[in-house]
Every structure is written in C-alpha cells, then in structure tokens.
Amino acid sequence: GAAKMAVIGFMNALKEEGRKHNITVHAIAPIALTRMTEGIVAPKVAPLLKPEFVTAAVAWMCAEENEETGHIIEAGAGYYAKVEVREAHGALFGTDTIPTPEQIRDRYSEIADMSQASPFANTSEALRKVFRMVAPKA
C-alpha cells in the first residue's frame, strides 16, 4: 500500500514538472498475473489476467495524441477505469486549541463523509485548501 501511494505521489510531482515542458505522466494500476500473484489466483481466473490486457492502456497513455496527464488507470482482464484519490470535505476544528482524540471520534462521521469529496490533485493544492479555511479573515 505505502509503496503504491509513493508512486502516485511521485507521479503527481512529475505531472507538475512535466507540464512546463509538455511532458505527460500517468500511473498504471495493473490487473495481471505475475510471479508474485500466480500462487494465490485461482487457476480458472489466471488466463484472464494476461499482461497483454494491460499493454493497450500503457500504449494509449504514452501516445503523443493523448494530452491528459496525471491519471491513474486500472487496466487488465479486459477492464479499464480511471482511478482517483479523493479527499472528503472534512471538518474544521480551528487553530485555537489542539483537538483531543475524543473530539476527532465525535466528529469522525463528518471527517470521513465522502458525499462532497473532490479529487486530491496534489499536496500543494490540498495545503492551499486548508490554508484558505484557517487563514484569519481580514
């Protein structure tokens, strides 16, 4: 899990840098049989997980005509989907006092409510959102 999120973070950093030079970058979340997974996949499912099912998505993401950047594409077994990391609207406690674990518990349903979630574009954008909420109003 952590290594995969590191890849997404790295992709987001490269996306911002690459944009300046007309370079696109993506991440593939493959659904394919590998040496690591072949012992845990049912034998009747294994033929569906050919790596070749992933290559079409990789080729499209690398194509010059594809102007998108920073996408995570799940690909394999004949299935393809864009995947997003999303951020809930969250809960603002303010900066006057540090919240207690009990306060987090009491408002956790608000913290975890994904009904107004938005794509988590990158850390800089997430920080800007937080700073806009907590900045003193002039």
Residue ranges and their predicted role:
Residues G18, I23-P43, A81:
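Flexible, glycine-rich beta-alpha linker
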Residues I8-G9, K15-P30, N66-A75:
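Conserved Rossmann-fold SDR core element
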Residues A6-G9, F53:
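Conserved cofactor-binding/catalytic machinery of classical short-chain dehydrogenase/reductase
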Residues M11, K15, T37, V58-A59:
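Generic hydrophobic alpha-helical scaffold/packing signal
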Residues A3:
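Active-site helix of classical SDR
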Residues A27, V45-K137:
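C-terminal helical subdomain
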